[in-house]
Regions:
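N-terminal amphipathic alpha-helix/helix-capping segment at the start of soluble metabolic enzymes
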Residues: 1-22
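Hydrophobic faces of well-ordered beta-strands that scaffold small-molecule active sites
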Residues: 5-11, 32-36, 62-64, 76-78, ...
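Active-site beta-loop-alpha junctions enriched in small/polar residues
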Residues: 10-14, 39-41, 67, 81, ...
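Catalytic cores of alpha/beta
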Residues: 22, 26, 61-76, 101-113, ...
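N-terminal active-site wall of soluble small-molecule enzyme domains
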Residues: 26-89
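Alpha-helix-loop-beta-strand connector modules within alpha/beta enzyme cores
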Residues: 49-63, 83, 89-102, 130-153
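Glycine/Thr-rich beta-alpha phosphate-binding loop at enzyme active sites
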Residues: 73-82, 94-139
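Glycine-rich phosphate-binding active-site loops on the catalytic face of alpha/beta enzymes
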Residues: 80-89, 116-130, 156-177
């Protein structure tokens, strides 16, 4: 179950040579989740199978980003744009999550009965996006009917801060990869 997960990694768009080793290291230990978000040039069946196999060792969860795939037979993470435009039917046997930046997106995630949301950017990130801060993160997390993860500028050490503000865990690219 996603409720057991404290860390959700997100793959870099352009993975480096040591990417699969980093994926294996990421999946070591406790159960985690990984959102596959790759540039089309790297989105191959071979790579996806290797990631899926690595996840099985720790009973971890693989989720596909909607930028790559909105298949009905997979765990799917919706970008905020895809969330707001989503008209599909919810598949109950699979996870559905979404990226949220404001109350309107949180409400849409509630309407779709998403299992989790990533709220961002909580802190100043490498892209210079304006952070919402921990207080706003807590407000948005409280307004969501499922579980929430902090994303954007967070580090592994911020896990307790996320939990203290009503979150379940943290999510990120650079903090894991």
């Amino acid at each position: 179950m996603i409720t057991e997960v404290k860390h959700i990694g997100i793959t870099p768009l352009h993975p480096k040579e040591d990417f699969l080793k980093k994926v294996e290291n990421f999946f070591e230990g406790v159960k985690k989740a990984l959102i596959i978000r790759l540039d089309e040039a790297f989105y191959t069946q071979d790579l996806l199978e290797k990631i899926e196999n690595s996840s099985k060792k720790s009973n971890s969860i693989v989720i596909y980003n909607s930028r790559n795939d909105i298949g009905s037979k997979k765990n799917i993470h919706l970008t905020s744009i895809d969330l707001m435009n989503y008209k599909g039917k919810r598949e109950c046997n699979f996870l559905l999550g979404a990226s949220c930046h404001n109350q309107n997106e949180v409400e849409k995630a509630n309407q779709l009965k998403c299992d989790y949301i990533l709220i961002s950017p909580v802190l100043k990130d490498k892209h210079g996006n304006k952070e919402i801060g921990w207080k706003k993160f807590g407000e948005l997390a409280k307004n969501f009917n499922g579980i929430s993860y902090a994303l954007g500028g967070v580090k592994i050490e911020d896990l307790s801060e996320s939990i203290n503000h009503g979150g379940t865990g943290i999510s990120g690219i650079s903090c894991f990869f």
